[in-house]
Amino acid sequence: MVHWTDHGEILNSSQVPWGRKEGGFMWAPDCAYKNGTYYFYFPHPSETNWDNSWKIGVATSCRPAEGFEVKGYIEGMDPLIDPCVFVDDNGQAYIYNGGGGICKGGKLKDNMMELDGLMQPMEGLEDFHEATWVHKYNGKYYLSYSDNHDENWNDGVKGDNRMRYAVSDSPLGPWESKGIYMEPTDSYTNHGSIVEFKGQWYSFYHNSALSGHDWLRSICVDKLYYNPDGTIQIVKQTK
């Protein structure tokens, strides 16, 4: 978790045959692994009017950081961004996306590239904005996301999005909001992932400490801790 290797660009909008002819706009993606294949999910618009033509594309590879080939996009999803794919212990995969206060989720077929039924709204999320992430801890499902917080904090700096979470007994809810687990960074919005590595849980997020510009963000990671009742402690952001 200290020494990292930059493997370079793994996908470009020029490789997306159904994408907007002007290219660009490949925003926050996700990647899942199943049966020897890595599935890379990315939001990309298909038309010049990019704001209303988002699709969730799928590219696959047998390696995690190279060789990805675009296979198409998932049909039947609303034009939203920020895909998240969660594979449960029984092998069933779920996909989520959202933005603008809307969060939806649904089952994926075994091929990981088609919906198994309809996407449905995720009920019970308090002040949802974007950046869905789902993980499982002690038999419970956790859905984390960035909120719409936009108030001043005690340091006088314009407030940015906080990271919230909700808990459920089902990967598709209904969800019970549990509050905030990360205060704002300096990059306006935030997009977090919660993962376990060698017995320790970590919170991945981003800030703009290196660039000084809230649209040029760097990946950060800090340890994450649960309370005995399953709630998440506020993550301490380190430098």
Predicted features, each with a name:
Residues 1-239:
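Carbohydrate-active catalytic/glycan-binding domains of CAZyme proteins
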